[in-house]
From Swiss-Prot:
Gene (UniProt): CCL4
The UniProt record lists the keyword Transmembrane: no
InterPro entries: Chemokine_b/g/d, Chemokine_CC_CS, Chemokine_IL8-like_dom, Interleukin_8-like_sf
Pfam families found in the cross-reference section: IL8
Name of this chain's protein: C-C motif chemokine 4
Family from the record: Belongs to the intercrine beta (chemokine CC) family.
Primary role: Monokine with inflammatory and chemokinetic properties.
Species for this entry: Sus scrofa (Pig)
One GO BP: positive regulation of cell migration
Subunit structure as annotated in this protein's UniProt entry: Homodimer. Interacts with CCR5.
Keywords associated with the record: Chemotaxis, Cytokine, Disulfide bond, Inflammatory response, Secreted, Signal
Length: 92
């Protein structure tokens, strides 16, 4: 009986120290995609297929546009053309 309790305790300790999900506080993962610069040129609308907004954990807000060729382009969310493209993509 003592052996079972010892083995079980050891397994619990190993699981607690080896599992990052159990040992890290919730929400502590760093953001996976952040933009540090914005494009200086307006993208042609017919090049853009999709978009997403970066995480609020990033140092600056950004909209990332996906192009037909699979490229990702960071844009300033306060630019008028960016808002227009986002609205257009939401409607389609």
């Amino acid at each position: 009986m003592k052996l079972c309790v010892t083995v079980l305790s050891l397994l619990v300790l190993v699981a607690a120290f080896c599992s990052p999900a159990l040992s890290a506080p919730m929400g502590s993962d760093p953001p996976t995609s952040c933009c540090f610069t914005y494009t200086v040129r307006k993208l042609p609308r017919n090049f853009v297929t999709d978009y997403y907004e970066t995480s609020s954990l990033c140092s600056q807000p950004a909209v990332v546009f996906q192009t037909k060729k699979g490229r990702q382009v960071c844009a300033n969310p306060s630019d008028d053309w960016v808002q227009e493209y986002m609205d257009d993509l939401e409607l389609n």
